């Protein structure tokens, strides 16, 4: 078990510009996002919170005082791990720290290992209930990824494992430093970068995982930690 370093100060930054490729239909704008086409054409648009494509981005969803409280609680009270994955016959540690909380009936295969729910600690239930209420989803599992600085990352993937009930949305809560979450359309290859800052909530609707891949690239200038909590509805196992 590898534990995360505890930092007393989490650096925060928020990008406010938005560039959009005209071929996309935006419902009400996209907060702090860049959408790029293969030709590199960009358009500027207003910085507003709202639904774009197959996800909804709500900046500053969590109150400022609550952000610091939940960041500190999660970093200090969760047992962090840095699992290994086998790539081309060699074992490598994933470039981030991870943890998993869930109902006891839940099992989830992630990063080459099966994670089994052991129930929810009392201290975490208020946040679970808050996110579930906002998302109108009965979340029964949460995956934690702690990016210690801008060197930690996540490759292209979709949260489409068979254990996940794809009829419900996935809620992603960001705490700590800002990072760009990249989306890539599975068919067209179009890209969209969404800047997620401290306290932001991203709701990915059921079609998002089917239509888009996403990942978190390296950002060498980021020196502080970012914590991402993704709440999901899992199919229970006997």
Residue positions per predicted region:
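Non-heme Fe(II) oxygenase metal-center motifs and adjacent flexible, charged/small-residue loops
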Residues: 20, 24, 35-238
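Short N-terminal alpha-helical targeting/association segments
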Residues: 1-2, 11, 19
